[in-house]
């Protein structure tokens, strides 16, 4: 009986243990039987698939009712149009991750066996927002397709998706030919890239005195170098690590031996004949060279890797096989390296990689690949916040820092900052006033290289009438933009207004130069002294004072400091006044004088005289007027005619003494005083009636000193 009860208790304990969750090594289970070293913690409930999709949804996409499947959510484009070639991923395959955690073989091989529809099923079963992308009902409705790159699932746009359209899954059409995203080439291309990167890293870590015949180190044992080499590959395409490649394929083994490529290398053996023939070197004029096959179009090895490949200090340069005559050339570009020269010689610095579209040459092949995106329009770097895409990784990183408000390259001379070192260098040319980029045909210099490239296109145009003549004056213009700016001269339109003073300008560049007068910014500094100027023409005129350059007038020989002042000076000799006033017709030689004159026609005259109240538009005009109110200093008396010829009139001041007389002796007033009233009708003249017995001397005395009117009461005294 007791034995039965013990068996019953042991059965209950076994049942209870079976219901409890199994503990693994990650939860602190001790295999020696001592128990758990760490207890279980409360795990919060996992979020639903819709919540995960909302959290991982890129910018420019939104969730909404699907038109392909009723009562289901779909992914809609609500931002900028999605261009073909846009790539999202790698996707997190939910089923594969669960099976991998349980120790079961993943179902990627099963999906691959099902063909392209297996990838569609895997995309629908992913754990991100791509699980809500519905299938299209017809092939014509599909615009996105699942693709695999190095056995990792991605989602790619293969048709233009306009705003307001739903993203619908459909396998990528096979008529587009082999591409990087198809499963047939991604594995071999990834193996080729890892082989290339590993060999370059092995050459880098090898010592200079190492024998070339010694096999290179196994890449599996150099994990830090392998990680560094993997990071050198462009982030546009993420390839698996060396461990994953070694699991899916045979061990790579030594790649270089006795200076030749190992013919038994598994990576080379796995490559198809097209890739093997394309990995051959383009021979240099001296007959030697080496190359490594790049993964595919768009894979950009780092500049540091290309520099190592071109370095003459490499001690184990591989020699590639000669391509077979009948081998088919594929679209994979090659990385070629100059042969190592003698000791002490510098590497070749020629720009050997030339663009077939525009003829621009580059030092490194990776730079040529980046430049090719300009012509193809391929922009693999997509901003998930605003939806803008870039073809350059440097510009993309600077754009992402701009969302955070970070500009890591400030200008040391002003308060501006930039996101890239290239933009900062172009800006610093503005402070120096230099124009380092000169046209080799006409000699015109520019401060920026893009401006020079645009200028060179004007020389490529044949000598023919300009396609954009002005309909008003017939002047030929280069393009429509120049014509629009020119038409503002005829229409008088000035669309660019200054927010500080309200002054209008025809061109935006003139407004920017004018705003510096308000902000006090002086970016143009003189290289000879400490002066700075807000506009570049002012700096050029100032530089003449240091160089001693002068412009002589051909008429009078006067030296002027700039051509603008010389032209204005020549108008003084010719009598030309090309700036007339539209209101009164008065003309001037300079536009600045005309603008100053136009202010006199304004009704508002803020500068008024405190004495007489007369108004003026300019302060200098008011100061000139106030000089007329100042009392004149006493001066020498003018000569007077003889008293015998005509009577003499003398004005008396406030002092009792007389200031001027017609004789040397003092004149005394007579007893007879005649009062005369002078009116305006007599034209500022008065007549004193003559008496036959009166003396010829008369004295005029003002009754009230200081009056300016002519209607005054004066006293005329008869001298005895």
Swiss-Prot record:
Family annotation (Gene3D superfamilies): Classic Zinc Finger (3.30.160.60), SET domain (2.170.270.10)
Q: Which GO terms describe its cellular component?
A: nucleus
What positions are modified (Phosphothreonine)? 322
Recorded hits in Pfam families, A to Z, give: PRDM2_PR, zf-C2H2
Q: Where primarily located?
A: nucleus
Bias (Polar residues): 275-285
Task: Tell me what effect the entry lists for residue 541 to C.
Answer: In RP72; decreased localization to the nucleus
Tissue specificity is:
Highest expression is observed in adult retina; abundantly expressed in the fetal eye. In the retina, it is detected in the outer nuclear layer, especially cone and rod photoreceptor cells, ganglion cell layer and both outer and inner plexiform layers (at protein level). Expressed in retinal blood vessels (at protein level).
Q: Where do the TM regions start and end?
A: none
Q: Name one GO biological process term.
A: regulation of transcription by RNA polymerase II
- Output the InterPro entries linked to this UniProt entry: PRDM17_PR-SET, SET_dom, SET_dom_sf, Zinc_finger, Znf_C2H2_sf, Znf_C2H2_type
Recorded consequence of changing residue 455 to Y: In EVR6; severely decreased localization to the nucleus
Ranges of biased composition (kind: Low complexity): 287-296
Q: Which UniProt keywords apply?
A: Disease variant, DNA-binding, Metal-binding, Nucleus, Phosphoprotein, Repeat, Retinitis pigmentosa, Transcription, Transcription regulation, Zinc, Zinc-finger
Q: Does the keyword Cytoplasm apply?
A: no
Annotated segments matching region Disordered: 201-350
Compartments, as annotated in UniProt: Nucleus
Entry GO MF terms? DNA-binding transcription factor activity, RNA polymerase II-specific; identical protein binding; RNA polymerase II cis-regulatory region sequence-specific DNA binding; zinc ion binding
Residue ranges of the C2H2-type zinc fingers? Answer: 353-375, 381-403, 409-431, 437-459, 468-490, 496-518, 524-546, 551-573, 579-601, 607-629
What the protein does comes down to:
May be involved in transcriptional regulation.
Q: Which PANTHER family match?
A: C2H2-TYPE DOMAIN-CONTAINING PROTEIN, PR DOMAIN ZINC FINGER PROTEIN
Provide the disease association from the record: Vitreoretinopathy, exudative 6: A form of exudative vitreoretinopathy, a disorder of the retinal vasculature characterized by an abrupt cessation of growth of peripheral capillaries, leading to an avascular peripheral retina. This may lead to compensatory retinal neovascularization, which is thought to be induced by hypoxia from the initial avascular insult. New vessels are prone to leakage and rupture causing exudates and bleeding, followed by scarring, retinal detachment and blindness. Clinical features can be highly variable, even within the same family. Retinitis pigmentosa 72: A retinal dystrophy belonging to the group of pigmentary retinopathies. Retinitis pigmentosa is characterized by retinal pigment deposits visible on fundus examination and primary loss of rod photoreceptor cells followed by secondary loss of cone photoreceptors. Patients typically have night vision blindness and loss of midperipheral visual field. As their condition progresses, they lose their far peripheral visual field and eventually central vision as well.
Specify the protein name.
Zinc finger protein 408
Q: What is the lineage of its organism?
A: Eukaryota, Metazoa, Chordata, Craniata, Vertebrata
Source gene?
Answer: ZNF408
């Amino acid at each position: 009986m007791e034995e039965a009860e013990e068996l019953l208790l042991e059965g209950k304990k076994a049942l209870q243990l079976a219901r409890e969750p199994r503990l693994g090594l990650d939860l602190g289970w001790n295999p020696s039987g001592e128990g758990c070293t760490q207890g279980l913690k409360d795990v919060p409930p996992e979020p639903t698939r819709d919540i995960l999709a909302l959290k991982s949804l890129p910018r420019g996409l939104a969730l909404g009712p699907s038109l392909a499947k009723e009562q289901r959510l779909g992914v809609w484009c609500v931002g900028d149009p999605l261009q073909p070639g846009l790539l999202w991923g790698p996707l997190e395959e939910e089923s594969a991750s669960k099976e991998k955690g349980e120790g079961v073989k993943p179902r990627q091989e099963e999906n691959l066996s099902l063909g392209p529809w297996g990838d569609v099923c895997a995309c629908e079963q992913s754990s991100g927002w791509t699980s809500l992308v519905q299938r299209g009902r017809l092939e014509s409705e599909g615009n996105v397709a699942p693709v695999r790159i190095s056995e990792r699932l991605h989602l790619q746009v293969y048709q233009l998706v306009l705003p307001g359209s739903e993203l619908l899954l459909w396998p990528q059409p096979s008529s587009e030919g082999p591409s990087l995203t198809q499963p047939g080439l991604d594995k071999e291309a990834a193996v080729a890239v890892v082989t290339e990167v590993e060999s370059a890293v092995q050459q880098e870590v090898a010592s200079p005195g190492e024998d070339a015949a010694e096999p290179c180190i196994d890449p599996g044992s150099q994990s830090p170098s392998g990680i560094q080499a993997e990071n050198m590959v462009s982030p546009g395409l993420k390839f698996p690590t060396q461990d994953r490649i070694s699991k899916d394929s045979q061990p790579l083994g030594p790649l270089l031996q006795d200076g030749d490529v190992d013919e038994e290398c598994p990576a080379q053996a796995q490559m198809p004949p097209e890739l093997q023939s394309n990995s051959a070197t383009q021979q240099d004029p001296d007959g030697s060279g080496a190359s490594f096959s790049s993964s595919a179009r768009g894979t950009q090895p780092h500049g540091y890797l290309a520099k190592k490949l071109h370095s003459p200090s490499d001690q184990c340069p591989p020699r590639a096989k000669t391509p077979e005559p009948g081998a088919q050339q594929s679209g994979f570009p090659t990385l070629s390296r100059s042969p190592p020269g003698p000791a002490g010689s510098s590497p070749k610095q020629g720009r050997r990689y030339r663009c077939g579209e525009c003829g621009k040459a580059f030092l490194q092949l990776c730079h040529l690949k980046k430049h090719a995106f300009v012509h193809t329009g391929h922009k693999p770097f997509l901003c998930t916040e605003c939806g803008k895409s870039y073809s350059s990784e440097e510009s993309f990183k600077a754009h992402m820092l701009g969302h955070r408000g970070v500009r890591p390259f400030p200008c040391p001379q002003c308060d501006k900052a930039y996101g890239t070192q290239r933009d900062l260098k172009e800006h610093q040319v503005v402070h120096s006033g230099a124009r380092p980029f000169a046209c080799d045909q006409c000699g015109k210099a520019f401060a920026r290289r893009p401006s020079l490239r645009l200028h060179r296109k004007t020389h490529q145009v044949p000598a023919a009438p300009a396609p954009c003549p002005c309909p008003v004056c017939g002047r030929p213009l280069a393009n429509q933009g120049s014509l629009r700016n020119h038409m503002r001269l005829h229409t008088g339109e000035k669309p660019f207004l200054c927010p500080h003073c309200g002054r209008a300008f025809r061109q935006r560049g003139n407004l920017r130069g004018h705003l510096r007068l308000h902000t006090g910014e002086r970016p143009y500094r003189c290289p000879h002294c400490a002066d700075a100027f807000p506009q570049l023409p002012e700096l050029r005129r100032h530089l003449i004072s240091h160089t001693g350059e002068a412009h002589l007038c051909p008429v009078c020989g006067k030296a002027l400091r700039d051509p603008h002042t010389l032209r204005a000076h020549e108008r003084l000799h010719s009598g030309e006044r090309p700036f007339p006033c539209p209101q009164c017709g008065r003309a001037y030689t300079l536009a600045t004088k005309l603008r100053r004159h136009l202010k006199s026609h304004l009704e508002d005259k803020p500068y008024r005289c405190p004495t007489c109240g007369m108004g003026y538009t300019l302060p200098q005009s008011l100061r000139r007027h106030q000089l007329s109110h100042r009392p004149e200093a006493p001066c020498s008396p003018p000569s007077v005619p003889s008293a015998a010829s005509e009577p003499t009139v003398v004005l008396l001041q406030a002092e009792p003494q007389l200031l001027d007389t017609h004789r040397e002796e003092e004149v005394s007033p007579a007893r007879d005083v005649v009062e005369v009233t002078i009116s305006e009708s007599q034209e500022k003249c008065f007549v004193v009636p003559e008496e036959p017995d009166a003396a010829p001397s008369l004295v005029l005395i003002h009754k009230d000193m200081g009056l300016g009117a002519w209607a005054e009461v004066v006293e005329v005294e008869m001298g005895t």
